[in-house]
């Protein structure tokens, strides 16, 4: 019998392996933070909440709505989820006022999370928004591009290009309106390509012949539409390869967002031939544009021609102050502009696509906006023409501001903001250790769903409504889920006139504080121009239910699966 018993060496090896496995399990298994609700079943599994989350992703092609659903499930404004084995849980927060305090005041305790870098770092390794505020990789590029969001630059350079591209888009829709004869057509690509046109034009300059929307207009004017299944299908036209490359790379972020291992997913994607090709096309295009701007600088042109030319002029000035040669071709400049193209076109196009749907389904709001525009721009109305760019930017129309904000509140192009704890701290009275990712959700209770009952004392001092200034109002539970732009208006005492109130209630469409969305000013100006021209020219008619789903899909931003128009020209 003794011959079949394991020897000491085998026993030691087996024992060591068991010890290592047990130690690894203990190291990797979920470790809940005390007092914060969580899924009990997930806490006992090595993969935590990953199986449930991925099941939701496979069904819906969305991820962040699942995070918000946990707060409803546990009836708590703060929950935790176990997404990365061996790592700290994700903390999910839906209380608007605690979120505002974190973003606006507690900037020494919370900063940009590395989570965003995991999503975009593979294709944008030096884009500034993924780095901590104290990091030179954040500060130096930001100093180069800050002036692009100055009101003067937007007014003189960027917004005129938005106006031009939107006018071309309305010509496409005028042609489609005439040919469709009251039947619906998909507007999604029209909106996406017009957004790309305006971003490319303001960033690099874009001639009429290079405009994809102009090409689509020619295609519509010279081809007969095809009627299928009670909708009209129009020709798409040819998509320039650099536009296609931007869309390919933007859509690749979808896969990283929906993956529990985004860094690995991004690496795998970058090995694929079509992604490699898209990266090469994008890099060559930006390099060619840099070459063109450098020639302008060498020829002595110092008046900014476009955003890239302006940034390179700034690089020249900074280099002179630093006593070095300007580096016009550094990777950070390339990444800043590609990030600008990718995020800028996708978020504004998505917001407009959702806005088309909400205004179509809320004809009272649509009519009120049209009346407000014609009242605010009486000369254009009298002369029966489009408002000029100068007329639009010089005229303040409170209801237009309100419509834009209400669309953003409902659309939730970016449904969350994520911050990382820089030190051991508290959130809603719960201990949160250093390194924890805190997801501040903008699509749940307090934003679009009934406010959760929470004693003010449970919040951090800066988040208490009775003690802290600078907090927004609270949305009325009776209509919090309704599309109602009027919620953003208040009457001026004494005159009774209405004014737009950006603090009427909570929203996180652009984040808040020093690390809020860099492109917020341009995005708001863009949406105001687009909605103004669209509603000035067209009545958005009711869409058949089969073409009017409100399902969304997570790409770079959350976009609607269907965006159809039935248009009637407004005299």
PLM feature spans:
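N-terminal membrane-proximal hinge/A-helix region immediately C-terminal to the signal-anchor transmembrane segment
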Residues: 3-127, 136-140, 163-168, 434, ...
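Conserved cytochrome P450 K-helix E-x-x-R motif and the immediately C-terminal K′/meander segment
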Residues: 56-72, 386-428, 449
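Cytochrome P450 heme-thiolate monooxygenase catalytic core
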Residues: 114-118, 157-352
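Cytochrome P450 I-helix active-site segment
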Residues: 235-238, 361-413, 433-436, 459-461, ...
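Short, small-residue alpha-helix embedded
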Residues: 347-360, 530
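Cytochrome P450 heme-binding "Cys pocket" and the immediately downstream C-terminal segment
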Residues: 363-366, 503-506, 512, 520-558
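Conserved cytochrome P450 K-helix/beta-meander segment immediately N-terminal to the heme-binding cysteine loop
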Residues: 443-497
